């Protein structure tokens, strides 16, 4: 708030919170030349994975690839510390392929701490921020900590995770904490409220951890990693294969369900002590039993937390029920009849700022120089947090240098889709990225994230010469191979063509290009290699890149045409001083929603909940009338 302060140190940018969002933000700002301070409540928990120690999965893997393509860190971290890797949805098309890595949580945190502590231009310090220092024009000029130390800066990025007003619950017992064993951040929520920000409460939770030595694996279904290891990062320097560990699958039983149903009144939510919304797509086991009452069993995955850690993560079994009941629930699962519980499950509720209070740059609308990223914006997940942290970091640097900030269009990346959803939709539950949230998922694949975003990363300054040369070489090889496949023909009487017809039971009339062979259902690049028609000099990712571009070329072009058509109108900018409440042709709900969100473009306005196509049409007509009146007035002057 506005006071006179004796600042201890001065920085360009201060990042509050050193989770996955804060680390990406701080590394980006420091690497782009800004003197940065990263403040955290606990130096030993930098980039900690308090819930599932895993990176990736549907839509989340695309986010991770995109962060890496721009020059971020989370993809490299997952590749450096993986315990197991699997491709999910491999039987379906490439638009929904998803790489998932189980990671070593202690190793992950140790390596990330080492990276941030040794990054040029970045200083890391343990402290709790309780206040924002504003200048005469209500702009950010610094922060103040709980113990009264003030630091001067030009921009602040809040990446506070679940720590703002955090309270953890086990049954009807609660304590102030951002997560188990760590106190919550106090004071900052009150500061934000005084500044006019709306805050709300959200809830999440984490399952119990059990001792791996107490589990009977005899009848559990093994879930091994993939033989062929895939990578999140596009940087081959990080591609070092490691020994993989096995995960296991068990299921809930009628006994499990009865225990939960009989004791629902003891859970924080069903008991009425917590009314904050939890994540729809990562429900507690109580929610599953209630919402899917007709299901007699639910899958439960048993996953290692590290190579040298005895703890197992019981995925799909998060709960807020009392601790003594939790052990009975665990021991009702096959294989866990004699398990030892090392840490109880708990629910955590915390403050967040609905992200409609941010521009798509992630700078807040009320305070210049204040950015928000991660769970404070209402998201859930390390990958969503990392993506926002990177964007906030990039734009904080742009702000400090007085350069135009970057907005990521939703049709160019999952990052853009994520931020556009956050800034335009009135979300009241934790937001998780899903492939279904993108209208353009055929184009927004993991394999082409570098093609879509690395040129931007280079322009921003986060992609160095070595990475850029690797990128250019890969793209040149893919384009060259596509040309070869489109121009190389085999004739129906050639020996290789006769063999292909015999094996595939599909005729070749006259001749056919290798590209058209690839377009056939069930025919892949590995089949070309089987008939010595492939290019032995190419890397796997280059072969796959060429195959996907050719096999799906028709669909890709159709989607690109849709994007081009929409973008012609949707990028039309809206006046920042537009009084939506006075536009009588808009529905009342649209007036209220548009006035609250203050969208920057027609496209953004069209995606706000409660704004329908008729409202957009009315808005376009209104703008056209205003424009003509302006021209008429100007002509008469």
Curated annotation (Swiss-Prot):
Function: NAD-binding protein involved in the addition of a carboxymethylaminomethyl (cmnm) group at the wobble position (U34) of certain tRNAs, forming tRNA-cmnm(5)s(2)U34.
Cofactor dependency: FAD
Superkingdom of origin: Bacteria
UniProt entry tagged with the keyword Disulfide bond: no
UniProt-listed SMART domains: GIDA_assoc_3 (SM01228)
Location(s) in or outside the cell: Cytoplasm
Gene Ontology cellular component annotations, sorted alphabetically: cytoplasm
One of the GO BP terms on file: tRNA methylation
Any one GO MF annotation of this record: flavin adenine dinucleotide binding
Keyword presence, NAD: yes
SUPFAM superfamilies: FAD/NAD(P)-binding domain (SSF51905)
Binding residues for NAD(+): 278-292
Pfam families, A to Z: GIDA (PF01134), GIDA_C_1st (PF21680), SAM_GIDA_C (PF13932)
Subunit structure: Homodimer. Heterotetramer of two MnmE and two MnmG subunits.
Binding site for FAD: 17-22
The protein, known as: tRNA uridine 5-carboxymethylaminomethyl modification enzyme MnmG
Signal peptide range in chain numbering: none
Keywords per UniProt: Cytoplasm, FAD, Flavoprotein, NAD, tRNA processing
Family per record: Belongs to the MnmG family.
Primary location class: cytoplasm
């Amino acid at each position: 708030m506005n006071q006179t302060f004796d600042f201890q140190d001065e920085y360009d940018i201060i990042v509050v919170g050193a989770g996955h969002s804060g680390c990406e933000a701080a590394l980006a700002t420091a690497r782009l030349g800004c003197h940065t301070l990263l403040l955290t409540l606990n130096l030993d928990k930098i980039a900690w994975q308090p819930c599932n120690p895993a990176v990736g999965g549907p839509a989340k893997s695309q986010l991770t690839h995109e962060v890496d393509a721009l020059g971020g860190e989370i993809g490299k971290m997952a590749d450096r510390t993986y315990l197991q890797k699997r491709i999910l949805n491999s039987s379906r098309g490439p638009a929904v392929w998803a790489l998932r890595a189980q990671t070593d949580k202690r190793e992950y945190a140790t390596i990330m701490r080492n990276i941030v502590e040794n990054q040029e231009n970045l200083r890391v310090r343990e402290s709790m921020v309780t206040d924002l220092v504003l200048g005469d024009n209500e702009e950010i000029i610094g922060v103040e900590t709980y113990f009264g130390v003030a630091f001067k800066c030009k921009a602040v990025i809040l990446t506070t995770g679940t720590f703002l007003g955090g309270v953890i619950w086990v049954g009807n017992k609660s304590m102030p904490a951002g997560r188990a064993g760590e106190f919550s951040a106090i004071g900052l929520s009150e500061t934000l409220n005084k500044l006019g920000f709306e805050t709300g409460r959200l809830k999440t939770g984490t399952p119990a951890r059990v001792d791996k030595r107490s589990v009977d694996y005899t009848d559990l279904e093994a879930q091994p990693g993939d033989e062929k290891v895939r990578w999140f990062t596009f940087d081959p320097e990080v591609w070092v294969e490691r020994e993989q560990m096995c995960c296991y699958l068990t299921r809930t039983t009628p006994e499990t369900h009865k225990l939960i149903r009989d004791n629902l009144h003891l859970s924080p939510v069903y008991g009425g002590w917590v009314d904050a919304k939890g994540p729809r797509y990562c429900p507690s086991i109580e929610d599953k039993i209630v919402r899917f009452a007709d299901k007699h069993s639910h899958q439960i995955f048993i996953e290692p937390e590290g190579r040298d850690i005895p703890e197992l993560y019981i995925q799909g079994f998060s709960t807020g029920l009392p601790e003594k009941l939790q052990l009975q629930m665990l021991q009702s699962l096959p294989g866990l009849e004699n398990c030892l519980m090392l840490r109880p499950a708990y629910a955590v509720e915390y403050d967040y700022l609905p992200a409609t209070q941010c521009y798509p740059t992630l700078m807040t609308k009320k305070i210049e120089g204040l950015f928000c990223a991660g769970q404070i914006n209402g998201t859930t997940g390390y990958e969503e947090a990392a993506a926002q942290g990177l964007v906030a970091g990039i734009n904080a640097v742009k702000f400090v240098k007085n350069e135009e900030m970057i907005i990521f269009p939703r049709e160019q990346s999952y990052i853009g889709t994520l931020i556009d959803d956050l800034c335009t939709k009135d979300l009241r539950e934790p937001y998780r990225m899903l492939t279904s949230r993108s209208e353009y998922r055929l184009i927004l694949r993991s394999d082409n994230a570098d093609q879509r975003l690395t040129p931007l990363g280079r322009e921003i300054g986060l992609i160095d010469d070595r990475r850029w040369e690797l990128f250019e070489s890969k793209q040149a090889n893919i384009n060259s191979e596509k040309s070869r496949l489109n121009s190389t023909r085999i004739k129906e009487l050639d020996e290789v063509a006769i063999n292909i017809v015999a094996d595939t039971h599909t005729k070749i009339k006259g001749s056919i290009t290798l590209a058209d062979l690839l377009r056939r259902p069930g025919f892949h690049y590995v089949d070309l290699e089987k008939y010595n028609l492939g290019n032995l000099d190419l890397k796997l990712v280059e072969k796959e890149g060429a195959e996907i571009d050719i096999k799906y070329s028709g669909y890709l072009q159709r989607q690109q045409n849709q994007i081009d058509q929409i973008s012609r109108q949707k990028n039309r900018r809206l006046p920042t001083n537009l009084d939506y409440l006075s536009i009588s042709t808009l529905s009342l709900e649209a007036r209220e929603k548009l006035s609250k969100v203050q969208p920057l473009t027609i496209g953004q306005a069209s995606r706000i909940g409660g704004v329908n196509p008729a409202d957009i049409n009315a808005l376009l007509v209104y703008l056209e009338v205003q424009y003509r009146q302006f021209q008429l007035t100007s002509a008469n002057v």
